[in-house]
Amino acid sequence: MAALRDTYNDPVHIAVIGGTGLRELPHFTQVASLNITTPWGPPSSPITILHHTCSTSGKVVPVAFLSRHGLHHEYAPHEVPARANIAALRSIGVRSIVAFSAVGSLQEAIKPRDFVVPDQVIDRTKGVRPWTFFEGGAVAHVGFADPFDEQMAKVVRACGHSLEGDGVVLHDRGTLICMEGPQFSTRAESNLYRSWGGSIINMSCIPEAKLAREAEIAYQMICMSTDYDCWHSEAADVTVDMVMANMKMNSVNARNFIGAVLDELTKDEHAALVQAKHLEGTCKFGLSTSPGYLSAEALTKLSWLFPGYFSNN
C-alpha cells in the first residue's frame, strides 16, 4: 500500500470521532493522514482523510476520522486532548461531527447492543478536563440548553434501518450521564443516575460536545449500549471484557450505521447542515470581553481557531 499523503487541500466538512470499539472505518478509501499541531497541542491521533462514495449518488466526499482515545487506546477519558481534537478538525474545514461511544445502560428497555441517539446530557465530570476555548483573558458564554444538534439527530435517527439482528433497537432520545471515570460507577451512583432520569452513561461526551458547540460545529453522538452498568439485580456488573465483547459482536452494525449516516449527510439537501450554517456566528456573538481587552495569548489562540473573528481594534 502506497504511503498516505500528509496534506489535503480541499475542505473537509464532515468528521467521525471514533471511541471504544470504533477506531477505524473499513471500506472507505484512505487518502491522507494529517498531523496537525494546534495552540492546545496535538490531537489524540492523526486525522485520517477518507473518501466516501455515497451509495445513492455516487458522489465522492472527503470525511475526517479521528480516534478519540488514540491509535492504541492510550488516552484515559480525562486525558483526551479534546480542545486539540476539536480545534484540529475545525482547522481543516469540519463543521459537522458524528461521534461514536460505547455506553452503559441505565434503563431496562435499553438492552446491550441497542443504539441510542441522546438528546440531553448531565455533566458529572469533575473539572479535571479543560472544557472551554475561552479563558486566560477571553470570556464567552455559548448556549448549551440542547447539547446535541437536533438537525443532525434527525438525520441519524432516519438511518436506523441499517441496523440488523434480532431485537436490536434504535432509541430516538435519551439523557446521557457523562461521568469522570476512569473507574466505573458505584452501585449507589448508578441508582442515583437512574432516579434522575438518566438513560445511558459514558465518560466521553463532555467536554467534547461543549467544545464542538463553542467551535460552531454541529455535533451528534451515537451511543451503543454494551452493559447495564451495575444497577441491574439480574445482570453482571460492567467489566472491560463485557464492553469489548458486545462491541465486537455488534461491530458490523456500528460501522453500517455510521456508513448510512454518512451516505445521508453527503446528499445535497443536507449541504447547509453539513456546513453548520445555522451555528455561524453563535460563538462570535457570545463573547463578553470588551473589544480591545482580549489578552494577547487569548487573541492568538482564538484567531487560530476562528480566523478573522476577533480583534482588539
Swiss-Prot record:
Binding-site residues for phosphate, renumbered to this chain: 20, 68-69, 101-102, 204
Keywords: Cytoplasm, Glycosyltransferase, Nucleus, Purine salvage, Transferase
UniProt cross-references to Pfam families, sorted A to Z: PNP_UDP_1 (PF01048)
EC number assigned by the record: 2.4.2.28
Pathway: Amino-acid biosynthesis; L-methionine biosynthesis via salvage pathway; S-methyl-5-thio-alpha-D-ribose 1-phosphate from S-methyl-5'-thioadenosine (phosphorylase route): step 1/1
Cellular component terms (Gene Ontology): cytosol; nucleus
Domain of life: Eukaryota
Site feature (Important for substrate specificity) residues: 185, 240
Membrane-crossing residue ranges in chain numbering: none
Binding site for substrate: 203, 227-229
Single GO biological process annotation from the record: L-methionine salvage from methylthioadenosine
Main EC class the enzyme belongs to: transferase
Catalytic activity: S-methyl-5'-thioadenosine + phosphate = 5-(methylsulfanyl)-alpha-D-ribose 1-phosphate + adenine
InterPro entries in UniProt: MTAP, Nucleoside_phosphorylase_d, Nucleoside_phosphorylase_sf, Purine_phosphorylase-2_CS
UniProt subcellular location: Cytoplasm; Nucleus
GO molecular function, one term: S-methyl-5-thioadenosine phosphorylase activity
PANTHER family: S-METHYL-5'-THIOADENOSINE PHOSPHORYLASE
Family, per entry: Belongs to the PNP/MTAP phosphorylase family. MTAP subfamily.
Entry function: Catalyzes the reversible phosphorylation of S-methyl-5'-thioadenosine (MTA) to adenine and 5-methylthioribose-1-phosphate. Involved in the breakdown of MTA, a major by-product of polyamine biosynthesis. Responsible for the first step in the methionine salvage pathway after MTA has been generated from S-adenosylmethionine. Has broad substrate specificity with 6-aminopurine nucleosides as preferred substrates.
Protein name in the entry: S-methyl-5'-thioadenosine phosphorylase
